């Protein structure tokens, strides 16, 4: 049976660990009380024994040897017993101070326990009430947002129905349309799509005839009036409320902003467009935000009211944001319920232990009643709000389908099966066997000797090294997942991975083992085909590349489809860095790419070799010595650093011009400069460029080491209680951190090999390059653990266990 202390430590929410009952410390206090009471009993027993030794022997024993048995012996025994009862009083008086001190010592520890338990109770109550108030306020805000959204959709649906009715009446008075015209859309009652079908898009404002545009303007004015009236009823203000229907401006005059002097008042100006605040996380949303700002500028200059249209995309994004916010709210409520139940159970268990040790039943009962009356134990507001959120989510977002609603609100964790473990072992054993077979065949064929086939080495090295580096990186990611799980680092929350997207360490090991098994099998088959003289044997690596590409883009729900699609989304965000909001998963993956530059170079050669059809004629020099190839290699060498620098610039603008992001971008710029200098040195190895390589690479390495240790890992803090580390550490053995710093320093200096000019053969040179690339990947996998550990501790320090979703409708000040 698992002890409660272990179960408790394994169940607490990592980000809220400091707010939970310190069960371990209370248990230590109980153990101290137990030890003190045991010492008391031993001291009392020793005092009694000492008192017995101080008693004089009974008179009967004194005289028994000289006088024998007498009928007066009972009388003497009574007298001796009476004198013995009187004499120990002096010894007891002598022992009283010690016993009293021991009793006071025990009372002191019991009092210390009760005071500590009371402090823990106050801490739990304070945290619970704060979180409860925050979640209740968030719930009220979300209900208000949902009410606003419902009003907007209702108004738009009413106007869409009126427009459809007018169109139907107009069509009855007009000749029938030609057969090529599209039929009218059908109404989808519960889907909600029809509610948004009548909204105009920015492009539609300039379409159609003049009469149609005037009709759209007047209709847009009416829609805008009703939408903003509904939103104002819900307490939302707008930018540009200077122009009202009565034509009065801020200064009280009756002229509008565009009003002339004579005839009849100012031009009617509506308030600015409905400000649905959608974060510009993608190019589409960014373009929509730019369009909205342009519309605001035009509105202030007296543009037509058609610019006040609410767009369908904005409503859809607003609805999605509100749905995600409800899911995050429900997640927070579930965590707070878990926080409450675990603390109640912890107090119950620890008080039972205290009663057994101290026998303070009355004090324990009083404290138990205090715990029961505490807000975290007695309040039912969280339970009520959770039930309300379930009903609201089911009604508004899943069409009253409770099963679908629970899939969103309570996503089920995938069950671990032993089949994955079995497949990992199977593929690993197969890989080892095939690798031994390949090593024997390669040795017999002599392909790795100096007199071997250089073309085979040039072709096979690039293609299969690419897969080997990918497999190694996935394997190290699996090691990271294993360590993060054991140390309770909430990596899925940090990366914002859903339950069906996140991999386990077994999944990563399975992917790595299957890739390597397939690669080595292809190596063995390729070697057999070459020795047999089969034509187009070099097409096998291309077939392997085509197979892997097909698996990556496979649309069927096999081979971890959700994870593959998530990977492709992250890669899209990296490639188009300035146009997408930079999330933790995006820049973490971009950092991985900076360690995979050799992999990108291998991909470049492979694409050139097979797309140009070189495997038919074997002129691999086409893809290694061409001028365009060299220029492309130069671009690829610093492309990951360029993407990462763009991400830093995007974060600099988004996070209020944080200077740290500019400094981080400078780190990647220095790496690009060092890569460019090394590339130039490889082309023209002169003494001048040797010194330039040493200077640029040394500067970039110092910059990177500082950022690794201080910013990414949080080390080198001179005021830390852990010397030259940080205050909070997850691993208990501090020497591991010092060794890791030295290892990171050594692996960061791998670039020194490029200036040593070691004279070795072509085969050995290829193997050395592969080894250095592997060491860089190992360094990155080693870096990953401490980077996420530091991020996790930052979340713990801020009690951040639930993501914050920005709300679309926000209150804005008037101009």
UniProtKB/Swiss-Prot annotation:
<feature type="transmembrane region" description="Helical">
    <location>
        <begin position="459"/>
        <end position="479"/>
    </location>
</feature>
<feature type="region of interest" description="Disordered">
    <location>
        <begin position="83"/>
        <end position="108"/>
    </location>
</feature>
<dbReference type="GO" id="GO:0030643">
    <property type="term" value="P:intracellular phosphate ion homeostasis"/>
</dbReference>
<keyword id="KW-1133">Transmembrane helix</keyword>
<feature type="compositionally biased region" description="Basic and acidic residues">
    <location>
        <begin position="97"/>
        <end position="108"/>
    </location>
</feature>
<keyword id="KW-0472">Membrane</keyword>
<feature type="transmembrane region" description="Helical">
    <location>
        <begin position="539"/>
        <end position="559"/>
    </location>
</feature>
<dbReference type="GO" id="GO:0005315">
    <property type="term" value="F:phosphate transmembrane transporter activity"/>
</dbReference>
<feature type="region of interest" description="Disordered">
    <location>
        <begin position="242"/>
        <end position="266"/>
    </location>
</feature>
<keyword id="KW-0592">Phosphate transport</keyword>
<keyword id="KW-0813">Transport</keyword>
<protein>
    <recommendedName>
        <fullName>Phosphate transporter PHO1-2</fullName>
    </recommendedName>
</protein>
<keyword id="KW-1003">Cell membrane</keyword>
<feature type="transmembrane region" description="Helical">
    <location>
        <begin position="687"/>
        <end position="707"/>
    </location>
</feature>
<dbReference type="GO" id="GO:0005802">
    <property type="term" value="C:trans-Golgi network"/>
</dbReference>
<dbReference type="GO" id="GO:0006817">
    <property type="term" value="P:phosphate ion transport"/>
</dbReference>
<dbReference type="InterPro" id="IPR004342">
    <property type="entry name" value="EXS_C"/>
</dbReference>
<feature type="topological domain" description="Cytoplasmic">
    <location>
        <begin position="480"/>
        <end position="508"/>
    </location>
</feature>
<dbReference type="Pfam" id="PF03124">
    <property type="entry name" value="EXS"/>
</dbReference>
<dbReference type="GO" id="GO:0005886">
    <property type="term" value="C:plasma membrane"/>
</dbReference>
<feature type="compositionally biased region" description="Basic and acidic residues">
    <location>
        <begin position="243"/>
        <end position="254"/>
    </location>
</feature>
<dbReference type="GO" id="GO:0000822">
    <property type="term" value="F:inositol hexakisphosphate binding"/>
</dbReference>
<feature type="compositionally biased region" description="Gly residues">
    <location>
        <begin position="255"/>
        <end position="266"/>
    </location>
</feature>
<feature type="topological domain" description="Extracellular">
    <location>
        <begin position="530"/>
        <end position="538"/>
    </location>
</feature>
<feature type="topological domain" description="Cytoplasmic">
    <location>
        <begin position="1"/>
        <end position="421"/>
    </location>
</feature>
<feature type="domain" description="SPX">
    <location>
        <begin position="2"/>
        <end position="368"/>
    </location>
</feature>
<feature type="topological domain" description="Cytoplasmic">
    <location>
        <begin position="560"/>
        <end position="686"/>
    </location>
</feature>
<dbReference type="InterPro" id="IPR034092">
    <property type="entry name" value="PHO1_SPX"/>
</dbReference>
<feature type="compositionally biased region" description="Low complexity">
    <location>
        <begin position="183"/>
        <end position="201"/>
    </location>
</feature>
<dbReference type="GO" id="GO:0006799">
    <property type="term" value="P:polyphosphate biosynthetic process"/>
</dbReference>
<feature type="topological domain" description="Cytoplasmic">
    <location>
        <begin position="752"/>
        <end position="815"/>
    </location>
</feature>
<feature type="topological domain" description="Extracellular">
    <location>
        <begin position="443"/>
        <end position="458"/>
    </location>
</feature>
<feature type="transmembrane region" description="Helical">
    <location>
        <begin position="509"/>
        <end position="529"/>
    </location>
</feature>
<feature type="region of interest" description="Disordered">
    <location>
        <begin position="166"/>
        <end position="213"/>
    </location>
</feature>
<dbReference type="InterPro" id="IPR052486">
    <property type="entry name" value="PHO1"/>
</dbReference>
<feature type="transmembrane region" description="Helical">
    <location>
        <begin position="422"/>
        <end position="442"/>
    </location>
</feature>
<comment type="similarity">
    <text>Belongs to the SYG1 (TC 2.A.94) family.</text>
</comment>
<feature type="domain" description="EXS">
    <location>
        <begin position="624"/>
        <end position="815"/>
    </location>
</feature>
<feature type="transmembrane region" description="Helical">
    <location>
        <begin position="735"/>
        <end position="751"/>
    </location>
</feature>
<keyword id="KW-0812">Transmembrane</keyword>
<dbReference type="InterPro" id="IPR004331">
    <property type="entry name" value="SPX_dom"/>
</dbReference>
<comment type="function">
    <text>Involved in the transfer of inorganic phosphate (Pi) from roots to shoots.</text>
</comment>
């Amino acid at each position: 049976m698992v002890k409660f202390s272990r179960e408790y430590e394994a169940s607490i929410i990592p980000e809220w660990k400091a707010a939970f009952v310190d069960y371990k410390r209370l248990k230590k206090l109980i153990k101290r009380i137990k030890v003190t009471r045991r010492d008391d009993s031993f001291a009392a027993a020793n005092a009694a024994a000492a008192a017995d030794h101080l008693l004089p022997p009974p008179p009967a024993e004194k005289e028994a040897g000289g006088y024998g048995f007498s009928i007066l012996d009972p009388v003497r025994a009574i007298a001796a017993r009476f004198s013995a009862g009187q004499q120990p009083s002096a010894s007891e008086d002598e022992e009283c101070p010690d016993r009293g001190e021991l009793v006071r010592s025990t009372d002191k520890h019991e009092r210390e326990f009760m005071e500590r338990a009371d402090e823990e109770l106050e801490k739990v109550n304070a945290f619970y009430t704060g979180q409860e108030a925050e979640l209740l306020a968030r719930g009220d805000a979300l209900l208000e947002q949902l009410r606003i959204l419902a009003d907007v959709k209702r108004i738009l649906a009413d106007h869409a129905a009126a427009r459809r009715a007018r169109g139907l009446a107009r069509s009855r008075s007009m000749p029938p349309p030609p057969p090529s015209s599209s039929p009218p859309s059908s109404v989808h009652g519960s889907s909600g799509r029809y509610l948004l079908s009548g909204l105009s898009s920015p492009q539609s404002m300039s379409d159609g005839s003049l009469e149609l545009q005037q009709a759209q303007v007047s209709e847009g004015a009416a829609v805008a009036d009703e939408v903003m009236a509904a939103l104002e009823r819900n307490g939302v203000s707008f930018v540009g409320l200077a122009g009202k229907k009565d034509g009065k401006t801020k200064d009280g005059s009756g002229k509008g902003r565009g009003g002339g002097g004579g005839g009849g008042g100012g031009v009617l100006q509506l308030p600015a467009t409905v400000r649905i605040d959608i974060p510009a996380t993608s190019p589409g949303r960014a373009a929509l935000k730019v369009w909205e700002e342009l519309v605001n500028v035009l509105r202030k200059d007296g543009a037509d009211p058609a610019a006040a249209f609410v767009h369908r995309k904005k409503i859809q994004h607003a609805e999605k944001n509100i749905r995600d916010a409800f899911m995050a709210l429900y997640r927070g409520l579930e965590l707070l319920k878990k926080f409450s139940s675990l603390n109640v159970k912890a107090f119950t268990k620890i008080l039972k232990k205290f009663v057994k040790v101290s026998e303070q039943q009355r004090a324990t009962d009083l404290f138990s009643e205090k715990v029961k009356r505490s807000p975290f134990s007695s309040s039912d507001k969280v339970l009520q709000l959770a039930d309300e959120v379930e009903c609201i989510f089911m009604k508004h977002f899943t069409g009253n389908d409770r099963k679908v609603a629970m899939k969103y609100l309570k996503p089920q964790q995938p069950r671990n099966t032993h089949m994955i473990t079995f497949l990992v072992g199977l593929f690993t054993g197969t890989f080892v066997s095939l690798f031994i077979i390949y090593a024997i065949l390669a040795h017999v064929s002599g392909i790795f000797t100096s007199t071997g086939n250089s073309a085979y080495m040039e072709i096979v090295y690039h293609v299969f090294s690419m897969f080997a580096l990918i497999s190694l990186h996935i394997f190290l990611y699996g090691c990271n997942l294993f360590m993060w799980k054991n140390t309770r680092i909430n990596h899925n929350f940090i990366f914002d991975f859903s339950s069906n997207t996140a991999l386990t360490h077994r999944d990563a090991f399975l992917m790595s083992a299957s890739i390597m098994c397939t690669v080595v099998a292809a190596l063995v088959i390729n070697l057999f085909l070459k020795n047999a003289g089969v034509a187009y044997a070099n097409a096998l690596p291309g077939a392997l590349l085509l197979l892997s590409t097909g698996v990556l883009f496979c649309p069927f729900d096999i081979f971890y489809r959700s994870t593959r699609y998530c990977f492709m989304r992250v890669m899209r965000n990296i490639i188009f860095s300035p146009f997408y909001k930079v999330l933790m998963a995006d820049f973490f993956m971009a950092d991985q790419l900076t360690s995979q530059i050799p992999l990108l170079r291998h991909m470049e050669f492979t694409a050139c070799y097979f797309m140009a059809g070189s495997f038919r004629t074997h002129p691999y020099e086409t893809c290694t010595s061409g001028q365009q190839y060299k220029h492309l290699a130069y671009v690829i060498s610093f492309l990951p650093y360029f993407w990462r620098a763009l991400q830093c610039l995007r974060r600099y603008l988004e996070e209020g011009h944080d200077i740290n992001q500019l400094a981080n971008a400078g780190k990647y710029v220095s790496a690009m400069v060092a890569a460019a200098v090394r590339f130039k040195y490889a082309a023209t190895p002169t003494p001048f460029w040797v010194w330039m390589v040493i200077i640029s690479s040394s500067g970039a390495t110092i910059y990177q080491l500082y950022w690794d240790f201080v910013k990414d890992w949080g080390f080198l803090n001179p005021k830390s209680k852990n010397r030259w580390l940080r205050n909070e550490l997850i691993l208990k053995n501090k020497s591991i951190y010092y060794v890791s710093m030295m290892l990171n320093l050594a692996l960061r200096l791998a670039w020194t090999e490029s200036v040593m000019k070691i004279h070795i053969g072509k085969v050995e040179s290829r193997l050395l390059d592969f080894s250095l690339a592997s060491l860089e990947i190992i360094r990155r996998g080693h870096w990953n653990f401490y980077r996420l550990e530091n991020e996790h501790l930052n979340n713990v320090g801020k009690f951040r266990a639930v993501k914050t979703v920005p709300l679309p409708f926000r209150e804005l000040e008037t101009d």
